[in-house]
């Protein structure tokens, strides 16, 4: 094992000099002997000097400290021993429960499955969340993006999805917290514990306060753990919160390495970095990875290069809108902006497709009529339009749903709504079977029968 010495430290970037015939390869892990800090090789500068990114704080590092090359990339524990544990980017436990005991360790830099190994499927994954199951259904082995600005409920939606899928489908999940709040990571851990699903989730955190190296690589750490389960023949769920922070960490690293920035200050390698991660999140003939990624949208601008690059990789997009959150409708999913490739009569069936398009049609018409109502009032509308508006307002409220993970805030018990009940309920509203009920009866209920019960008490 060759050893070198530190020649320069600039923030998270550390230059290390090795003998010229023993220069480590790109992505190899190096270890600073005295403090056990891991460095990852990013560039070879010539004359035996490599430029590395520190996977931890570089405070107190000094020139000419000894560094050892490991001769291989960063490797992390994989297998059942990771379930129920909180780990950092290096796979080290941070939950004070002792070492993570697994038989194998895998390197975090792996190539994507070949074209021949990949498998496409059109099987639906039921989430129990009405608006998602009806309007932007998830495919097993697909990629889903939760788009939203600050504070519209991306993390809460993600927590609800993990809870529902772990309790209803009994599958394994891997959660990668990329540059999010430590408080959220803590809440998340306790939420999983209280729901008794912690033993089915592996948690990997690289939070906001950590150096950019950790935040850039933590998604790969989580993904490597998920790939192991997939290659065992399982159907895995991979949650990444937040993919924007992955891009942001890449921007910081890129600037520290001295690369020229591109549009809006992002790294010139934005598309390639995103592709490297996304192409590995895929289903093979042995097992599947279904991924749900929260995507922070800077200043609510969907054309920003980061969310725009992410869009290209997704099968379904769930757009969380501030305007809907302001109405008090949660989950604040925009029913007209959210899309899914699975919403096709050949995949979901004629009835589901027609009900979904019917719901969107009514909401679209209501959107068009809103200006007229604002200027002239409801009385100027035709009878047909009045009926459309009344139904649209009921549908809008009925798209809300009490969440299990939000019970502590709302005081209302959570609801899991099976897909067949969702379709039947919306079909009944569209067919006018509930035109006689007041619209507030439809707010924060599960099925339409609950709305009818609620109406009796209003």
Swiss-Prot record:
The reaction(s) this protein catalyses: ATP + H2O + 4 H(+)(in) = ADP + phosphate + 5 H(+)(out)
Keyword Hydrolase (UniProt): no
Chain sites annotated for binding ATP: 148-155
Pfam families: ATP-synt_ab (PF00006), ATP-synt_ab_N (PF02874), ATP-synt_VA_C (PF22919)
Keyword GTP-binding: no
GO molecular function: ATP binding; ATP hydrolysis activity; proton-transporting ATP synthase activity, rotational mechanism
SMART domains the UniProt entry points to: AAA
GO annotations of cellular component type: plasma membrane; proton-transporting ATP synthase complex
Localization (cell): Cell inner membrane
Keywords from the UniProt entry: ATP synthesis, ATP-binding, Cell inner membrane, Cell membrane, CF(1), Hydrogen ion transport, Ion transport, Membrane, Nucleotide-binding, Translocase, Transport
Family note: Belongs to the ATPase alpha/beta chains family.
Entry function: Produces ATP from ADP in the presence of a proton gradient across the membrane. The catalytic sites are hosted primarily by the beta subunits.
Protein name, UniProt field: ATP synthase subunit beta
Organism: Alkalilimnicola ehrlichii (strain ATCC BAA-1101 / DSM 17681 / MLHE-1)
Gene: atpD
